[in-house]
Amino acid sequence: MKLLYIAGPYTNPDPIVNVNAAIRVGMVLYERGLFLPHIPHTTMLWHLIEPRPIRYWYGLDLHMLERCDAFLRLPGESTGADA
C-alpha cells in the first residue's frame, strides 16, 4: 500500500477540529484500501509529552515527505503545510 502524507491547517482556527479532520480523511482513504496515511497532525500528542521547538517537527515532517508516495493538501490556510 502506498504511503500518503496528509498536510493541512493545524492551529488555525482550532487544532482539535483540524486534527479531527485530518484523521477522518486518513481513515477513509485507509479503509478504502487506497493509502496508508501519515498524519503529522497527530504529533500534537507527542508534543504534549515531549515538547520540542517547531523546527524539530518540521524536520520530522521533511523526512517523512521523502518517503511518502503521495501528498494530500487539505483546504485552509497553513503556513507549515505550505512551507
Residues covered by each model-derived region:
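Catalytic phosphate/metal-binding cores of nucleic-acid and nucleotide-processing enzymes, i.e., regions
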Residues: 1-83
